[in-house]
Amino acid sequence: LILEEEDFEIKKIDVTFGHPLYTTVADIFYIRSNADTARVLPIIPDGCMALVFCGNREKENIRAYICGVTDEIKKLKIEPDEYYIFIRFLPGIGYSLLDQPANKLTNKAIPLKGHMAGGEQILSILERETHLVERIRLISKVIRVNLHSESNKYLIKYCTERILQTQGNIKVEELAEESGFTARHIG
């Protein structure tokens, strides 16, 4: 994400040692528009899957999405007084929240509710009248509880199932394409 700081309030949340998502997220940040008109911001491909939350000061119409890795520049339209919270996972980590192939989410965003364990709880936390950092800490704890203990469990399970389905007649490159991981990581 690239943006000029004028017209926006930007807060980067500390994710150092002791944070519930330490070692699993690239970063967590909050952006709120102070502009009088809608602004468009570019989202640059970076290999990170993200949870994205959007709302306004009145905590009405809060939306939450699981966003897959993007391989093209996207445009994000931010309305006046609208905010976004981005929790960006390190490559390969975010998919352990889902139990589905990574390539199903490439260049897509799906609603958090109904697609991730703990989704309802996360939305209720966002509606609370508590400080931003506290809400993000609570959300992080819910994510940590629902994050599989090892992100590679998904990959191992998926690759094993595909190898059995194809009776061993599948190339590592095909597994990489299907799973969203690199052939080098799988091999």
Walk through the language-model features, giving the residues of each.
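Alpha-helical bundle regulatory/interaction domains
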Residues: 1-173, 178-183
